[in-house]
Amino acid sequence: MHIMEGFLPWQWCLVWWIIAIPFIVMGVLELRKLLKQDREYLPLLGVCGAFIFILSALKLPSVTGSCSHPTGTGLSVMCFKPYITAVIGFVVLLFQALLLAHGGLSTLGANMVSMAIGGPIVGYLVYKLLKNTSVIYLSRSSALQP
């Protein structure tokens, strides 16, 4: 769920921005390096951004009276790793704040840490952990049978 504009005191907004900025910088550096090697990644970057934008714009009602939504960063993090996904997430969250009023500019740092940095890092770690695991083993271990 996006943190709305004006919800956080300015001191906390600053703290979240200080945490988010290094990820954006590292992501931009990795993105520049990737695109210098091969510009063919541009369409895939666009698809990942569109996927995140569409999926995170879907609202699912929750019991508490607010709503939740998937972020869709898993696809991007499997293709481009966490730093580049942070840049894609930043662009998506910026567009959502400006066009859909989901979140705000002052709370963009906090929204980034939760949706464009934290989630993708966890997703990437799970992906790396399970990447070489057999599909049959995973399906057996995830089956809900007594």
Language-model segments: what does each one mean?
Residues 2-10, 22-75:
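Hydrophobic transmembrane alpha-helices
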Residues 10-20, 109-117:
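Structural signature of hydrophobic alpha-helical transmembrane segments
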Residues 28-32, 55, 60, 96, ...:
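Membrane-water interface at transmembrane helix exits
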Residues 33-36, 77-87, 133-136:
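Membrane-helix interface "capping/anchor" motifs
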Residues 42-47, 86-90, 113, 139-145:
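Hydrophobic alpha-helical transmembrane segments
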Residues 46-53, 79, 119-120, 144-146:
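Small-residue-rich segments of transmembrane alpha-helices in multi-pass membrane proteins
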Residues 56-120:
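Alpha-helical membrane segments and adjacent membrane-interface helices in multi-pass membrane proteins
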Residues 115-146:
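Short helix-perturbing small/polar motifs within transmembrane alpha-helices
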